[in-house]
Amino acid sequence: HVWRMDMKLDAKFNGVIFKVKDGTIVPDDEYMVFLAKDNAFAAILPIYREKCAEMGADIEHLAAVDRTIDRLRDWRELNYALNKLKA
């Protein structure tokens, strides 16, 4: 399937996503969802943070990613039985 401008970007999940900073709705064609239980996602999030730093992301964005990494780690430790693709 080829993505088109009139298609929802994330074909697996549905919902309404709001930006925390201003309460605006993020359009369906601008977001994707990854679950905390996904081991592949957990493994690449620190790499995403490194890439953001390399590309000049501001301190606020990097701090937000750091908080996300911390929350993800904590959730995964507390919910180990739910984690997918166990090594």
Model-identified regions with their sequence ranges:
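Short intrinsically disordered terminal tails
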Residues: 1-7, 79-87
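N-terminal acidic leader/helix
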Residues: 3-41
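Amphipathic alpha-helical packing elements
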Residues: 31-80
